[in-house]
């Protein structure tokens, strides 16, 4: 059967970020889509509005009459009744990334990989291409207001994809341009060692055809260490390290950055980015280098970067008022991401009090990185650590591991006003009290984590709005 003859696709775990994005892409491409998840909500409601059939819970009969079943790495195929029924009935069962790889066959693929920043960089590339008159197909593991969602089905030849390294998913993709945005220890439950993770990044980059290109962000030491193993055409980007594409004359001011890009010896001054942080400038350099490789005029690329307005849960300002109180929601869940997010708040609003509200994600990650979280959070004026968000893990498998490990690490690193508050209501009250404290330079309530801390951020934004300023979901 050819993909074009496939009529109905059933997706197990359709409510997840990556799965809902591919469901949206399939719907917009004309496929009939059904899907199941243990819980439903805003994401599945939106898919239903686009025509998907959504089931709450998993039942064998829900895969009847479908042509293929797609599932994510978070689903155990041997423990899911729908997958078992599909296999018994002779219905093909594939992982999400295999389906994505099939959809890429008809396009020139631009794939952004990295342990950090890939969502933002993918969205920047998509914004630049659209603003330059291209009509790309786009799939991102996050929500962009500019794109009005996480996917775009375009008529042009380019497909821009966020390439996830978890479970080696990105190795099933076929990029023409591969962006290596960052690389450090992550997903050790998949890889076991950093060396094994690096080998997968090398394999991913070398999947690029001889006429393609690999964009490497060399400010990351582990990327510098693997460059010698990449046998494709390379472009390097960096701020701290010598590179083909660099940034200088950097000025940060209240959530905006202006700078000069120097690409292959030519200066392009006056670049404006409407999101804070040096890490976002580095992301912009990767996007700019990608645009140059596609032959787009630099002036159009710069204009496109100026239109980039951020992603939901990537330093998303959910509330601000005239007193300088801000509620910011960010997906940061790795120590490097937490450090960059706190630093962005500090550099963008140097006179403000920064109160970090951090929810550790996964017991295994909390155990592995507790000390690193301590250093990353210690630059905030106050730190509240929530209970660990378990996701796919169980507390009983990690005795003694909780948010207290992170709180103690923050204290050892010199952090001020540190508290571990596992009770949600107590945490809500404490954060609201912080927001009510007068501060001459304002107060930033900075929520970070990959779990449901975003729900608390939304509630705080609603509580403090009081009719002044603006609150956003």
From Swiss-Prot:
<dbReference type="GO" id="GO:0005524">
    <property type="term" value="F:ATP binding"/>
</dbReference>
<dbReference type="Pfam" id="PF01225">
    <property type="entry name" value="Mur_ligase"/>
</dbReference>
<dbReference type="InterPro" id="IPR036565">
    <property type="entry name" value="Mur-like_cat_sf"/>
</dbReference>
<dbReference type="GO" id="GO:0071555">
    <property type="term" value="P:cell wall organization"/>
</dbReference>
<dbReference type="InterPro" id="IPR050061">
    <property type="entry name" value="MurCDEF_pg_biosynth"/>
</dbReference>
<dbReference type="GO" id="GO:0008360">
    <property type="term" value="P:regulation of cell shape"/>
</dbReference>
<keyword id="KW-0961">Cell wall biogenesis/degradation</keyword>
<keyword id="KW-0133">Cell shape</keyword>
<dbReference type="GO" id="GO:0051301">
    <property type="term" value="P:cell division"/>
</dbReference>
<protein>
    <recommendedName>
        <fullName>UDP-N-acetylmuramate--L-alanine ligase</fullName>
        <ecNumber>6.3.2.8</ecNumber>
    </recommendedName>
</protein>
<keyword id="KW-0963">Cytoplasm</keyword>
<dbReference type="InterPro" id="IPR000713">
    <property type="entry name" value="Mur_ligase_N"/>
</dbReference>
<comment type="function">
    <text>Cell wall formation.</text>
</comment>
<dbReference type="Pfam" id="PF02875">
    <property type="entry name" value="Mur_ligase_C"/>
</dbReference>
<keyword id="KW-0067">ATP-binding</keyword>
<dbReference type="GO" id="GO:0009252">
    <property type="term" value="P:peptidoglycan biosynthetic process"/>
</dbReference>
<keyword id="KW-0436">Ligase</keyword>
<dbReference type="Pfam" id="PF08245">
    <property type="entry name" value="Mur_ligase_M"/>
</dbReference>
<dbReference type="GO" id="GO:0005737">
    <property type="term" value="C:cytoplasm"/>
</dbReference>
<keyword id="KW-0573">Peptidoglycan synthesis</keyword>
<dbReference type="InterPro" id="IPR004101">
    <property type="entry name" value="Mur_ligase_C"/>
</dbReference>
<dbReference type="GO" id="GO:0008763">
    <property type="term" value="F:UDP-N-acetylmuramate-L-alanine ligase activity"/>
</dbReference>
<keyword id="KW-0131">Cell cycle</keyword>
<feature type="binding site">
    <location>
        <begin position="114"/>
        <end position="120"/>
    </location>
    <ligand>
        <name>ATP</name>
    </ligand>
</feature>
<keyword id="KW-0547">Nucleotide-binding</keyword>
<dbReference type="InterPro" id="IPR036615">
    <property type="entry name" value="Mur_ligase_C_dom_sf"/>
</dbReference>
<comment type="similarity">
    <text>Belongs to the MurCDEF family.</text>
</comment>
<keyword id="KW-0132">Cell division</keyword>
<dbReference type="InterPro" id="IPR005758">
    <property type="entry name" value="UDP-N-AcMur_Ala_ligase_MurC"/>
</dbReference>
<comment type="pathway">
    <text>Cell wall biogenesis; peptidoglycan biosynthesis.</text>
</comment>
<dbReference type="InterPro" id="IPR013221">
    <property type="entry name" value="Mur_ligase_cen"/>
</dbReference>
